[in-house]
Curated annotation (Swiss-Prot):
Residue sites binding substrate per the record: D282
Active site: E203
Superkingdom of the organism of origin: Bacteria
InterPro entries hit by this protein: A_deaminase_dom, ADE, Ado/ade_deaminase, Metal_Hydrolase
Entry annotated with the keyword Hydrolase: yes
Organism classification: Bacteria, Pseudomonadati, Pseudomonadota, Betaproteobacteria, Burkholderiales
Sites where the protein binds Zn(2+): H20, H22, H200, D281
Enzyme Commission number(s) from the entry: 3.5.4.2
The name this protein goes by in its record: Adenine deaminase
Cofactor, how bound (note): Binds 1 zinc ion per subunit.
Entry's Gene Ontology BP terms: adenine catabolic process; hypoxanthine salvage; nucleotide metabolic process
Length: 351
């Protein structure tokens, strides 16, 4: 399939919420090299092009190895601020109106970077973005699931002095061998603290991990969740309970979860009534921010304008926003899709 020009223009322009993006995964090779020079960090790649060429991932772990190496250049509040502002500018260009951004403090505290440096650098950039770009956002602190639950507890406690700067906790990193129940107690503690709960599940792990994230961790949203398609009863449950899945199609193909975007179950799950939302995950590494993910997905799958309206609506409905602000965003989406589509810009004739 090839998306028609009018629909392509609409999906580029529609208001969107981004609910699945790792701020460290927005670190472009050019910025990695700039920060490495600023901080005198030696990189194992001689050039930007050599680093980009290394982005030939075979699975989640091969990606994570490079992801953590890239993050090694982040040392100061200024570094985290600059990375975050770079993401915001790209998101605004893609008509992202609200973002709920993951950050991985353990990736940085393990290198001796204080957690306050991480949180303040990111949050200060988002505060400036709210004023400068009218960009709404919040932060979600993610635990690295390949580390222990004790380490997660220590991270949560260390973050509590900054409690007003993040709204929830999540769970990411290597899914294989690290089931949701490994983090049951720390999620229970986060729930007691009034934090929102999300978890990566059913990306490389089985459909059962999705159910366990809901039942054991009490996750309010599932990040990825595509393996739920293997369990018809689970798909029915997700639809019935309006559990949102934050799906990242380009990531799923890049990490070999699916061999081709045409094999992706997004459309089947959307048609089954699941609250699917569409996001970029780690866009610097997977070759696409929000609009690139939307366009590639609409190119590959039999999706139409009604699906695009639904995906945009789902993204705001699933967001952790105050009711009034959520209603305003939903009205903005509905108004956009009720208007007749504008013609795409004319292409100048060849000379």
């Amino acid at each position: 399939m090839t998306i028609d020009a009018a629909l392509a223009e609409q999906i580029r322009r529609t208001p969107k919420a981004e609910l699945h993006v790792h701020i460290e995964g927005t670190l472009e090779p050019e910025l990695i090299f700039r920060l490495a020079q600023r901080n005198q960090v030696a990189l194992p790649y001689p050039s930007v092009d050599a680093l980009r060429a290394a982005y030939a991932f075979t699975d989640l772990q091969s990606f994570l190895d490079i992801y953590y190496a890239g993050a090694s250049v982040l040392l100061t509040e200024e570094d985290f601020f600059d990375m975050t502002m770079d993401y915001v500018k790209r998101a605004v260009a893609d008509n992202v109106r609200h973002a709920e951004i993951f950050f991985d403090p353990q990736t940085h505290t393990a290198r001796g970077v204080p957690i306050g440096v991480v949180i303040d650098g990111i949050a200060d950039a988002l505060a400036q973005a709210r004023t400068e770009y009218d960009f709404s956002s919040s932060l979600i602190l993610c635990f690295l699931r390949h580390l222990s639950e004790e380490d997660a507890f220590a991270t949560l406690e260390a973050a509590l002095p900054y409690r007003d700067r993040f709204v929830g906790v999540g769970l990411d990193s290597s899914e294989k061998g690290n089931p949701p129940e490994k983090f049951a107690r720390v999620f229970a503690r986060a729930r007691e603290l009034g934090l929102h709960l999300v978890a990566h599940a059913g990306e490389e792990g089985p459909a059962q991990y999705v159910a366990d994230a809901l039942d054991i961790l009490k996750a309010e949203r599932i990040d990825h969740g595509v393996r739920a398609i293997d369990d018809a009863a689970l798909v029915e449950r997700l639809a019935r309970e309006r559990v949102a899945l934050t799906v990242c199609p380009l990531s799923n193909v890049k990490l070999k979860v699916y061999p081709d975007l045409r094999d992706h179950p997004l459309k089947r799950m959307l048609d089954a009534g699941v609250a699917i939302t569409l996001h970029s995950d780690d866009p610097a590494y997977f070759g696409g921010y929000m609009n690139a993910n939307w366009e590639a997905t609409f190119d590959a799958l039999p999706l139409d304008a009604a699906d695009a309206h639904k995906l945009a609506r789902n993204s705001f409905e699933a967001a952790f926003l105050p009711a009034m602000q959520k209603a305003e965003f939903l009205a903005e989406v509905d108004h956009f899709w009720s208007a007749p589509p504008k013609s795409p810009p004319a292409t100048a004739p060849a000379a």
